[in-house]
């Protein structure tokens, strides 16, 4: 993966590992390019936690999944995340077979932080891009003397 994708995936894993708010987790996921039909922040955050967080009792409930998918659905899943997600599922499947509750983001947290630490300028650049997208372009405003 290119450094940009490494950092974005690391930010997603860390947002889940550090139990950030739905908005922060969903933003990290959206920054990778995921899009959903209704753009539901709650759905995107739940989906990220389901993929990379610890297995929770509701994850084993078909009704929970049904309700989640009635709320929203994935329209585009980023290709850069496909292999990461598949690896996550394989590790979780192995852990479940061994009767372990394996949290991918918890296990990969140190490596995710390492990816961020290796690219500090890129992290700043991505944050500036995110701020610009959130706040709109910066406009020089005239100042008037009193």
Where is each model-derived feature located?
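Helix-rich C-lobe and terminal helical cap/extension of kinase-like folds
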Residues: 1-146
């Amino acid at each position: 993966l290119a450094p940009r994708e490494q950092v974005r995936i690391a930010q997603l894993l860390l947002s889940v590992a550090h139990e950030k708010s739905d908005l922060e987790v969903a933003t990290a996921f959206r920054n990778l390019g995921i899009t959903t039909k209704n753009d539901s922040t709650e759905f995107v955050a739940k989906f990220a936690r389901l993929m990379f967080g610890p297995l929770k009792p509701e994850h084993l409930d078909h009704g929970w999944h049904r309700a989640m998918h009635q709320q929203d659905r994935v329209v585009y899943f980023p290709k850069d995340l496909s292999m990461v997600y598949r690896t996550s599922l394989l590790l979780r499947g192995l852990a479940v077979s061994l009767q372990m509750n394996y949290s991918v983001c918890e296990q990969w947290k140190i490596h995710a932080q390492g990816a961020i630490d290796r690219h500090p300028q890129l992290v700043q650049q991505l944050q500036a891009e995110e701020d610009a997208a959130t706040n709109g372009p910066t406009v020089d405003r005239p100042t008037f003397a009193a």
